[in-house]
Amino acid sequence: MNICLFLPEEIGMPLALKDDRAEHILKILHKKTGDTFTAGIVGGASGTAKITGITDEGIFFDFTASGDGKPLYPLKMIVGFPRPIQLKRLLRDVAALGVCEVHLTGTELGEKSYMQSTLLEKGNAYKMLFDGTVQAGGTKIPGIFLHKTLSQCVSAVCGSRQENQADFSAPAAGKILLALDNVRPSQSLGDALGRFHGNLLSRGVVAAIGSERGWTDKERDFLAQSGFALCSMGCRIMRTETAATVAGAIILNEMGVMGNDERQN
């Protein structure tokens, strides 16, 4: 737990001793009255909390904001619904990277039963995103969305074909659309990103990653017709959650955000 996150209404209220955050503060960090710890407001500012007292009622603290909570980056990820255990790791990792949205979608080769997973119920998926955000020391939690089909997903995420393109000669206007595919790629992911000459951060990127069995030819055709460039990350076949994390890191590095020192946030 690299930051202790609170809802806005929790600021100014004692933190119950049985709360997981309180146990971390007292048993892991070994904090006592007068000490400080890194804290933040979910979706808001980050800063420092100073413990003003510890009683049976809980931990009393004062919060002082000092940072913006590490804003999320303009990278949206479309992911063919993976196995639930893979999805847990995927959500934690992409949240830690700072992806702004995760769109889970059914695919032609995807296992339909995965979409019925209880991971999407009772806030379990949100908890994975929350954990990844805390790991990164941020306060902004990525959005998560579920779509029955790839067509519905692309329509919801990308809008019209005219507003987005993978055309490298196109003006810096719409989102940059990239689909990971090791069967029929037109170029490598690195080459595709390199062609945008610094426009990645201003335009934003949508990266699509298939389920564990990949895309069908019909889906590849649909993605290409929708403006996605089919890109490879080499000849090695990766698990869905690995591909999502690796692709996210490569894209964010090309955006120029991976080298920025955000410790003050």
What are these language model-derived features?
Residues 1-68:
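N-terminal positively charged helical leader segments and presequences
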Residues 69-178:
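RNA substrate-binding interface of SAM-dependent RNA methyltransferases
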Residues 167-168, 186-199:
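Short loop-to-alpha-helix "cap/lid" segments that border enzyme active sites
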Residues 176-177, 202-208:
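Residue-level preference for the first positions of well-ordered beta-strands
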Residues 183-186, 212-216, 237-238:
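Short Gly/Pro-enriched loop/turn and capping motifs at secondary-structure junctions
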Residues 205-218, 222:
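A C-terminal functional module that forms or caps the active site or interfaces directly
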Residues 217-265:
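Structured adenosyl-cofactor binding patch, chiefly the S-adenosyl-L-methionine
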